Each structure stands twice: as structure tokens, then as C-alpha cells.
């Protein structure tokens, strides 16, 4: 048990940080069916400009995005989306929910079409007090990674600038000069060969 403890603590830490990352965006998202507080205009603009893409944690296929975000559930460690991508397959065999406070909920399991990773479930039948969950896709935070659109923009600009800094320019000019010297030497040898061939043809 003691040898498993560090691994368990590491997994819990990873899951917590992943959930907090998704929850951070949730705090900026629009009000959902649970009656979350409405966001300020600047928060709404920020969320629209930098939406999240949710990826399969195993094969990195896109599963959905934050534009279809409805809510996050801390008790079940999952996020609720209105729709998902074609990379999510639905097992049509209905199952009863085993989660606390979800008695009477009928679910269908969700899997990644690329790697068959279990992603969560979709609510197909719910009691009246949980009607807001019906037909929503519940993705487990453990099975989801996220990518913020535009997050690599600064890095790309930095790389572009790096290509044209003074040091790189000197190296490029040095390489061009070396290539010119090689071409000049090859042209000289080519002329010598052509001259010898010309003399040989005359002698014959």
C-alpha cells in the first residue's frame, strides 16, 4: 500500500489541476441551466476570443469545444456539453446511473472512436429534478485534455522573429558566401574539363 501511495497522490494531483483548469474557464462561461451567475461583458469577450478545444487524453482527437459548454460538476468530476464531435461514439445500450442523487437516470456510455477510451456518458432519461441534464454529454475530466485556441500564437511570432535577428542573418550570409565559393570552384573545374575535351577532340 505504501508503494502505491505516491502514485495515487500524483494521480489525484493531476486530476485536481486538470479540473481546476477547466473550472477556470467555466467561471468565465455563459450562465447555464443551473443558474450560474452571468459573466461580465469583458469576460464573455475573452471566452469567445479564446475558446477551449477538448481533446481525448489518450489519442488527442478533438471531442468538443467550450462553445457548447453547459456546466461542470465537481462532485462527479465531469463537464457537461450540449454537443460533441464525430470522434465520440455512443453505446446505445442503456445503463442506470450509479451516481449519488441520480436515481432513475438512464445513461449511454461514450467512447473515443480513435482509441476506444471511455469518455463518460450521455443522459437519456432523467427524473424531473434533473431534466436539465437530459441529452447532455457528460465527459469525465480524467479522460479530457484541453487546448486554448490561439495559445501558440505568441510562440509562433517569437520563432518568426528569431529567424530574422542579427545573429541568424550573419549565419545565413555566411552560408550563402560559402555556397558561392563552392559554385565558383565547380565552374572553374568544369571549364578545365571542357577545355581538355576540346583539345582532345582536335588532336584526334
From Swiss-Prot:
Main location: nucleus
Stretches assigned to the Mis18 domain: 51-149
GO cellular component: CENP-A recruiting complex; chromosome, centromeric region; cytosol; nucleoplasm
GO MF: identical protein binding; metal ion binding; protein-macromolecule adaptor activity
Modified residues (Phosphoserine): 13, 16-17, 204
Biological-process GO terms, alphabetical: cell division; CENP-A containing chromatin assembly; chromosome segregation; heterochromatin formation; pericentric heterochromatin organization; protein localization to chromosome, centromeric region
Superkingdom per UniProt: Eukaryota
InterPro entries (UniProt xref): Mis18, Yippee/Mis18/Cereblon
Keywords: Cell cycle, Cell division, Centromere, Chromosome, Isopeptide bond, Metal-binding, Mitosis, Nucleus, Phosphoprotein, Ubl conjugation, Zinc
Subcellular location: Nucleus; Chromosome; Chromosome, Centromere
Cross-link (Glycyl lysine isopeptide (Lys-Gly) (interchain with G-Cter in SUMO2)): 133
UniProt keyword annotation of Cell cycle present: yes
Residues annotated as binding Zn(2+): 56, 59, 112, 115
Function (record text): Required for recruitment of CENPA to centromeres and normal chromosome segregation during mitosis.
Assembly with partners or alone: Homodimer, and heterodimer with OIP5/MIS18B. Identified in a complex containing MIS18A, OIP5/MIS18B, MIS18BP1, RBBP7 and RBBP4.
Family of this protein: Belongs to the mis18 family.
PANTHER family reported in the protein's UniProt record: NEUROGENIC PROTEIN MASTERMIND (PTHR16431), PROTEIN MIS18-ALPHA (PTHR16431:SF2)
Protein name from the UniProt record: Protein Mis18-alpha
Organism this protein belongs to: Mus musculus (Mouse)
Amino acid at each position: 500500500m505504501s508503494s502505491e501511495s505516491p502514485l495515487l497522490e500524483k494521480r489525484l494531483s493531476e486530476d485536481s489541476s486538470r479540473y481546476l483548469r477547466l473550472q477556470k474557464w467555466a467561471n468565465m462561461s455563459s450562465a447555464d441551466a443551473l443558474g450560474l451567475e452571468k459573466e461580465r461583458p469583458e469576460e464573455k469577450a475573452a471566452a469567445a476570443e479564446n475558446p477551449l478545444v477538448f481533446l481525448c487524453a489518450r489519442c488527442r482527437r478533438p471531442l468538443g469545444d467550450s462553445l457548447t459548454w453547459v456546466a461542470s460538476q465537481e462532485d462527479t468530476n465531469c463537464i457537461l456539453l450540449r454537443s460533441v464531435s464525430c470522434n465520440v461514439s455512443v453505446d446505445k445500450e442503456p445503463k442506470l446511473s450509479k451516481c449519488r442523487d441520480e436515481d432513475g437516470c438512464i445513461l449511454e456510455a461514450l467512447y473515443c472512436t480513435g482509441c476506444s477510451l471511455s469518455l463518460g456518458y450521455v443522459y437519456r432519461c432523467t427524473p424531473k429534478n434533473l431534466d436539465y441534464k437530459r441529452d447532455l454529454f457528460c465527459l469525465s475530466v480524467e479522460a479530457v485534455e484541453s487546448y486554448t485556441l490561439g495559445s501558440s500564437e505568441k510562440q509562433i511570432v517569437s520563432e518568426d522573429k528569431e529567424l530574422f535577428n542579427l545573429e541568424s542573418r550573419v549565419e545565413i550570409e555566411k552560408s550563402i558566401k560559402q555556397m558561392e565559393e563552392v559554385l565558383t570552384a565547380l565552374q572553374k573545374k568544369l571549364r578545365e574539363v571542357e577545355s581538355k575535351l576540346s583539345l582532345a577532340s582536335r588532336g584526334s
